[in-house]
Structure formats: structure tokens, C-alpha cells
């Protein structure tokens, strides 16, 4: 296993464990044995997905996770949950078809079932229409997993209708794994055909199209979130917007930007999981998840209100929390990678991301205003003094993690950077054989020529020290 797989296997297990701790699960689920068995199947599929570069195994592992998540979405057997599960299944089936067809086209072009083999085939000559069509279909399929616009239409209904534990697994663990798969495809298999989304020097490739997808996701997610009267649906559109932020970093096609995106997806998962836990607790007590249901939360349950403050301000990117560190790292890395040529680079996309982040403050603060400023109705003004341990863990651990990662981001950023360091190490070994670094790319035991940038000076210094 490479460092990236090891890190994200631990991340998926941690997020899955926190999802199990969500307080309402036992009340919503009549058959907990079957429910937690499906959760284990879903986690198994996600764990297998993080560590593979084999196209067929990747599809099988993703579908193992997806089929389990479809069932988990409707497990509470309410009308709303049934609708959520059906929509999730239908959209998921279409996305799986796109993904499988795309993988088959890529295999037909490269005659290899591994991403390393795909990269070798692409480096041998110009990409064929088969490879281009295959990559487009793969991005569409993974866009569904990440809830990127316009492939996000399943998300609001699933977030609102599914049991809280299921939603947490979809929102946190599944999104993290989807990003890992996308990073592997773009940074290993299709790195040599990235093109450029720079404003002053746009080149054909996947980067400009990913930049457009990022812009659409950010605008759709943030604008539609403004009109929501359900906090769960608000978090669903927030997920769409945050997928856009992640794609801003990937559009730069740099190791440091990809590392920042991987850091942020973990932070996003913790913040969203914690916000869902607080929302589920409020929904259990008040009967609905409207922003008005949060009125007076600071008086009813001060610790939940403070935790909600941490979660939503982290999602909004307010310092000194981990959400700010993640967004700053992504946007600054995207700017640094894309302006090396002397053009304005991704200034247009990063500027749009900053504007959309400012807009997101409105709907996050509207919920916090209810929790901290508004008075609760007398019928709801009951102190929460008997919270179970699982409730404390589901809300408290993510809140503490966001504060710690905000103050000490190197705890997670440094291990993630080892993925980039390993890539640079491979290039360095090939340079020792007399092959120019800017014309080489190595993955595992394979070496081939491609047009890639030389390792960053900081990475070269780390390699020299090692």
C-alpha cells in the first residue's frame, strides 16, 4: 500500500466509526443487526477502493460500497426514506453505467487494466478518442459520488430522508474515497493529458473541463443553499459547493494542490458529520430540522451549540479552524501551481471560489443566529442533561479534531504529502539513470516518458535529506 492508501483507510474507518455513534440511529432503525452489517459491507467496499489502481477491481469495490449505501438510505422504512433510497439507486445505477463504460473504453485504448498501464499508453502518443471519451465518462461517474453539479440531484433528498447514520457515511467517507479515486485517475493515469485552465494560456485537456465543473458546482451549491428551509438539505447543497472547492485544487494539476484537496476532504467530512449529528439530535427533540428548530440551542444544550459553531464556521472557512487552513492551502496551491508560466493562471477560478465562500457565510450564519440569538419556544426550552456517551463522541470528537487540525495542520498535511514525495522519489531515481526529470514519470516499477513538471524544490530538499 502506498502512503495515500494507508492514510485514507484510517480516515474511512474513523469516519465510519463516528457515523455509528450518531445518536438517533437506534430509534430510527428497527433491525440494527442488518443495518450494521450493511455498514460493514459499505466500509469494506470503500476501504478496498482507496488502495487499488486496477480498473476492474476499482469498479467492483465501488459497487460493493454503493449497493450497501442504497439499502442503508432507505432502512428507516419511512416514505421519505424510501423516496431517498429510490432516487439514490436510480442516479447511482446511471452513474455506474457511465463509469463501467468509461473504464471499458480506457481498457480498449490502453490494453491495460491498471492506471500505470494507461499512463504508459498515453505517453506513447497522442490520446485517442477512446481515451478521451472514457475519461469523460469516468469523471461523470465519479462526479455522482462526489455530488458535483450537475450530477447532484440525488443529494438533497438523500440527506433529508435517509437515517442520520447513513447520511453521515455518504457525506463523509464516500466523498473522501471518491476524491482519492479521482486524484489517482488524474495524477497517475491521465497526468500527461491534463492541459491547462489558465486564463492566459488555456490548453486542451481535462484541466479546463474540471475547472468548469468546479465553477458550476460552487455556484449551484451556494446559490441553492440560500433558499433552503431544511438544515439537512442545506448541508446537501453545501456538499455540492465543497466539491467545487476540491475541484479548484485538482484543476491546477499539481502535487501540492492535490495534497491540499485531500486534507480538506477530511476536514469537510469531520465538519459535515458533526453538523449532521447536531441536526439529528435537534430533529429528535423538536420533530423537524428547520433553522427555527435550532432557536435557543445555546440555552437548551450549550455544548451542542458550541460544537455547531465549530462545524459551521469551519465549513465557512473562518480561522483558526481546520476549514480555513484547508481552503487557504487549496486556493494558494492552485494559484502557485498555475502562475508558474507567468500568466494569470487560475486567478479567475480562485476568485470565484473566494466569492462563493463569502456567500456561504450567509446560510451558515443564519443557522447560528437561530442557535445563539433567537429564544426557544417554552415547549422546547428543556435542558439536555442526559446525553448518552455515543452522542458526546459523535459530536465532541469531530469538534476537537477540527480545532486541533486548525492549530496543527501538519499532523495530517505532512503524511498526505508523502504521496507527492514518493512520486518525486521515483522521478529522482530515474534522473540518476540519466533521463531528464521533466520528461519522465515513474509509477511503481514502470517508467515512461511524458510531459511532466520537475519535482518542487521543497520536495527535492526532503528527498536529499532522506
Name these PLM-found stretches.
Residues 1-416, 432:
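Alpha-helical transmembrane segments of multi-pass membrane proteins predominantly involved
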Residues 2, 413-442, 446-453:
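Active-site-proximal region of nucleotide-activated glycan assembly enzymes
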Residues 59, 171, 421-422, 466:
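Small/polar loops that bind or transfer phosphate-bearing groups
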Residues 135, 465-466:
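Conserved donor-binding/catalytic core segment of Leloir-type glycosyltransferases
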Residues 453-465:
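A short helix/loop element that forms part of the nucleotide-sugar donor recognition site in Leloir-type
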Amino acid at each position: 500500500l502506498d502512503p495515500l492508501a494507508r492514510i485514507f483507510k484510517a480516515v474511512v474507518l474513523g469516519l465510519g466509526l463516528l457515523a455509528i455513534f450518531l445518536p438517533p440511529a437506534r430509534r430510527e432503525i428497527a433491525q440494527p443487526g442488518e443495518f450494521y452489517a450493511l455498514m460493514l459491507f459499505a466500509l469494506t467496499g470503500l476501504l478496498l477502493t482507496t488502495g487499488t489502481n486496477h480498473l476492474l477491481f476499482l469498479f467492483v469495490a465501488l459497487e460493493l460500497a454503493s449497493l450497501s449505501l442504497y439499502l442503508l438510505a432507505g432502512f428507516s422504512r419511512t416514505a421519505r426514506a424510501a423516496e431517498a433510497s429510490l432516487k439514490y439507486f436510480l442516479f447511482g445505477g446511471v452513474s455506474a453505467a457511465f463509469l463501467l463504460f468509461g473504464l471499458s473504453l480506457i481498457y480498449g485504448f490502453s490494453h491495460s487494466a491498471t492506471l500505470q498501464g494507461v499512463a504508459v499508453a498515453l505517453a506513447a502518443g497522442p490520446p485517442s478518442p477512446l481515451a478521451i471519451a472514457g475519461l469523460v465518462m469516468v469523471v461523470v461517474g465519479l462526479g455522482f459520488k462526489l455530488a458535483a453539479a450537475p450530477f447532484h440531484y440525488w443529494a438533497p433528498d438523500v440527506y433529508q430522508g435517509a437515517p442520520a447514520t447513513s447520511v453521515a457515511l455518504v457525506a463523509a467517507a464516500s466523498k473522501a474515497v471518491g476524491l482519492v479515486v479521482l486524484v489517482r485517475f488524474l495524477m497517475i493515469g491521465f497526468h500527461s493529458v491534463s492541459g491547462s485552465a489558465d486564463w492566459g494560456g488555456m490548453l486542451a485537456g481535462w484541466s479546463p473541463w474540471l475547472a468548469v465543473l468546479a465553477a458550476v458546482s460552487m455556484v449551484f451549491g451556494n446559490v441553492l443553499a440560500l433558499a433552503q428551509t431544511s438544515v439537512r438539505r442545506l448541508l446537501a447543497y453545501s456538499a455540492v459547493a465543497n466539491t467545487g472547492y476540491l475541484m479548484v485544487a485538482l484543476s491546477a494539476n499539481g502535487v501540492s494542490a492535490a495534497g491540499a484537496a485531500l486534507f480538506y476532504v477530511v476536514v469537510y467530512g469531520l465538519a459535515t458529520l458533526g453538523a449532521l449529528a447536531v441536526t439529528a439530535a435537534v430533529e429528535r427533540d423538536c420533530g423537524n430540522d428547520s433553522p427555527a428548530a435550532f432557536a435557543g440551542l445555546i440555552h437548551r444544550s450549550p455544548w451542542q451549540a458550541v460544537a455547531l459553531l465549530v462545524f459551521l464556521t469551519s465549513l465557512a472557512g473562518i480561522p483558526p479552524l481546520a476549514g480555513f487552513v484547508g481552503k487557504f492551502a487549496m486556493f494558494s496551491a492552485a494559484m502557485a501551481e498555475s502562475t508558474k508560466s507567468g500568466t494569470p493562471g487560475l486567478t479567475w477560478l480562485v476568485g470565484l471560489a473566494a466569492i462563493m465562500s463569502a456567500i456561504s457565510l450567509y446560510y451558515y450564519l443564519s443557522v447560528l443566529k437561530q442557535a445563539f440569538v433567537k429564544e426557544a419556544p417554552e415547549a422546547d426550552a428543556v435542558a439536555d442533561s442526559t446525553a448518552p456517551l455515543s452522542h458526546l463522541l459523535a459530536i465532541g470528537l469531530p469538534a476537537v479534531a477540527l480545532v486541533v487540525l486548525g492549530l496543527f495542520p501538519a499532523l495530517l498535511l505532512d503524511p498526505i504529502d508523502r504521496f507527492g514525495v514518493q512520486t518525486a522519489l521515483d522521478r529522482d531515481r530515474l534522473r540518476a539513470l540519466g533521463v531528464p526529470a521533466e520528461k519522465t514519470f515513474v509509477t511503481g516499477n514502470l517508467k515512461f516518458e511524458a510531459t511532466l513538471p520537475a519535482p518542487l524544490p521543497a520536495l527535492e530538499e526532503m528527498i536529499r535529506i532522506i
